[in-house]
Amino acid sequence: MIVEKRRFPSPSQHVRLYTICYLSNGLRVKGLLAEPAEPGQYDGFLYLRGGIKSVGMVRPGRIIQFASQGFVVFAPFYRGNQGGEGNEDFAGEDREDAFSAFRLLQQHPNVKKDRIHIFGFSRGGIMGMLTAIEMGGQAASFVSWGGVSDMILTYEERQDLRRMMKRVIGGTPKKVPEEYQWRTPFDQVNKIQAPVLLIHGEKDQNVSIQHSYLLEEKLKQLHKPVETWYYSTFTHYFPPKENRRIVRQLTQWMKNR
């Protein structure tokens, strides 16, 4: 439910931008909405950002990139960010911010209700997994780009994030295993009904490609539709030209689903 909608300066004449304040489990959470300026009915695109706090913040240029392909895009900032209420979590209670954002797109007058896609980058990958599980057949597709799928693996791989993870999650995977398991929903992947696309650079050192391998394997075991675009020379951040090309390709992939 939208509490407030304010115009935000857009560098593109083809896309209108708004900052949105919406309700998520009673909290006022902020996000960025992009609408194509041309009137019409569009697919919805839930953009789930990476990072935490000021790292990996939602960038208007990135949102416009996707909206320009013919989508109404909504990107939640997550609770505790940019004036939003509550404390930021890490694929914990903040999953509700993604669920509520999906429902917000369902209620948008210019969005085709049965054509809402989930996109997650980096930390947004696990947020997308959780949302695809929660929404089941309501989601048209799910794309994870350099996405996290396993929080214990993230803790092991990213020594630089351990302090933050212990603070936000409440301890180490050994101390609070149930908290990490709750945030790593492999046991519920059977509830995903949307076709899945996994995009990953094999040289990614922020989120190792192991995360995509694990999710791919799980989906295949369950005979779920999954496609993979793995790039042997790319890291977590793809070169700009390739990035733009893949944006066009993945949005076309979504529309074909």
Swiss-Prot record:
PROSITE patterns: PRO_ENDOPEP_SER. The keyword Signal does not apply. It is an enzyme of class 3 (hydrolase). Its EC number is 3.4.21.-. The active site is at residues 122, 236. One of its GO terms (molecular function) is serine-type endopeptidase activity. Keywords: Hydrolase, Protease, Serine protease. InterPro entries: AB_hydrolase_fold, Pept_S9_AS, Peptidase_S9_cat. GO terms for biological process: proteolysis. Belongs to the peptidase S9B family. This is Uncharacterized peptidase YtmA.
